[in-house]
Structure formats: C-alpha cells, structure tokens
C-alpha cells in the first residue's frame, strides 16, 4: 500500500485527508450502483472510512489485489481505470504493436473489470485483444505472446477468498511485469486522479471503433495445440477409458478444460 492520504498542516497537526476523499466519493456521480449505498452505510464511521481511504492499493510486479468495495483501498472500477491509465501511459512509450491482451476469471466483477480496462486502453488509442469468456492465466500469457502485445492484463485474485479481486500485469514475454516497468506504471498511476484522471470509453464504443477485438479461434486453437503437444502419453485418457473429475478451486478455468483431456 502507498503512503497514507494524510498530511501535516503548518501547525503540525495531522489533517485527515481521507475524510475529504470519502466525501468526494460520496458526492460523486458514481457509475457502479453498488458503491453509493456502501459509502452511505459507513458515514460517521471513522475507522471504516480510514481503512478505505487513508491508503490506496499499490501497484507492483504482482499488480493490484484487494477486497471488493468502495474506496481507494478497495477493488472497484475506478481503481481499475486508474491502474489501467498508468499502464497505458507506459505502453505508449514502448512502440511495437500498441496492443494489450486481457483475460479474467470467474470472481465477482472480473468481467466488468476486464471490460473497464479495455475501455481505458481503447480511449488511449491502444488496441485490445480480450477473451470472450473467462480463461486462466496461462491463456492470457499465451495470447500476449501470440498477438505480440506490449502487455497483458489478468483480472484475478488467485487463491484469495471470494471477497477479493485483483489485477495482474504481464510484459510482452507473457511473464509477470519486471520491477522497473512496474515502478514506471506505479509512478503514472500516482499522477492519475482515481475518479476523473483516466481516459475512458465504453466497451461497446471500443468494439465499434475497431480498437477492441476478441481473441480469435486461431489463438485458442494454437493454445490447445501447444498444450496437447506437451502430453507425455497422448490420448491415454481416451484409450484407457478413464473418467476424470475436475474442480476449479481457484476461480480461473471453464470450458477449455473439457478440450484438454
């Protein structure tokens, strides 16, 4: 987490800036209908307000991760927009295809956060390749390399409890973003106002403008072929008549698993 949103005035007294930030959110015309009732519910609760607004989620090599909800210290569409604007500012300095791949898991609001990130990138003139359904992290890594993207975004909180969600960033090699790149993105995030600083267009607008496209079957087929090529004993399950029971414990898989057997 970053520095507290608190400063000392010229008399040395601590000014609780988090209260001002809370009031700004409370007065704002928030697009996510879930946030305003949540903010109203904590009015007058200084401990709760401080927990949500005295600090902000910090972007690092593992991206962001936090509890869903209203505030700078929570995962919501505004924190996602802010983070994506920081990433977009970095991508625009990298040349190349100016493209970012996006995937997401089945956690609460993962699809919303993924489309929100796509809208910020598109508003910055950056092309997006996003999966049309939830796919696991390796699929995001593969798409990042397949389309020769500058970066990849995976909306997931890995093994954390259901109340969490997260935002992971990957480099052009499909691996976790390096320390140096993450530090630059974090600096750009710090320059971006969480409520108003990010450029943004709707997902539908991005699709209409041709900036947002879904990951194609060519990429998916290449992914499955790459996995199948690494089988130690191809076709063993089918020839042996084995029946497999699969449970997705970490929220990140779906239909793709039916094909890889």
Model-derived features with residue positions:
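Short, Lys/Arg-enriched N-terminal segments with co-localized hydrophobic residues
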Residues: 3-16
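An N-terminal, well-structured beta->alpha segment
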Residues: 22-117, 212-244
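Ferredoxin-reductase
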Residues: 23-28, 95-172
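Gly/Ser/Thr-enriched, mixed-charge loops and adjacent short helices
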Residues: 48-53, 57, 165-253
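Short, glycine-/Ser/Thr-/acidic-enriched flexible segments
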Residues: 64-66, 71-73, 107, 135, ...
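Residues on a specific face of well-ordered alpha-helices
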Residues: 85, 115, 119, 138, ...
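Generic, well-ordered alpha-helical scaffold segments in large soluble proteins
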Residues: 86-90, 120, 124, 143, ...
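Single conserved hydrophobic/aromatic residue that forms the stacking wall/gate
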Residues: 251-261
């Amino acid at each position: 987490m970053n520095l507290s949103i608190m400063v000392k005035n010229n008399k040395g007294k601590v000014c609780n800036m988090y209260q001002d930030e809370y009031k700004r959110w409370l007065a704002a015309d928030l697009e996510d209908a879930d946030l305003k009732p949540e903010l109203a519910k904590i009015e007058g609760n200084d401990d709760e307000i401080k927990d949500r607004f005295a600090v902000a989620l910090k972007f690092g090599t593992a991206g962001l991760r936090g509890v869903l909800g209203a505030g700078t210290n929570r995962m919501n569409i505004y924190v996602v927009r802010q983070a994506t604007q920081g990433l977009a500012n970095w991508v625009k300095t990298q040349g190349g295809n100016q493209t970012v791949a996006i995937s997401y898991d089945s956690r609460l609001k993962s699809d919303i956060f993924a489309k929100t990130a796509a809208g910020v990138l598109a508003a910055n003139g950056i092309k997006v390749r996003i999966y049309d359904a939830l796919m696991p992290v390796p699929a995001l890594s593969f798409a990042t390399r397949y389309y020769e993207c500058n970066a990849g975004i995976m909306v997931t909180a890995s093994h954390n409890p259901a109340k969490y969600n997260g935002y992971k960033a990957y480099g052009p090699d499909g691996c976790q973003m390096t320390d140096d790149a993450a530090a630059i993105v974090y600096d750009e995030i710090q320059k971006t106002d969480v409520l108003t600083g990010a450029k943004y267009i709707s997902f539908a607008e991005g699709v209409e403008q041709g900036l947002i496209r879904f990951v194609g079957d060519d990429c998916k087929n290449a992914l499955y072929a790459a996995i199948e090529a690494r089988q130690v004993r191809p076709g063993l399950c089918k020839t042996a008549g084995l029946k497999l029971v699969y449970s997705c414990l970490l929220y990140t898989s779906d239909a793709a698993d039916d094909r890889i057997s």
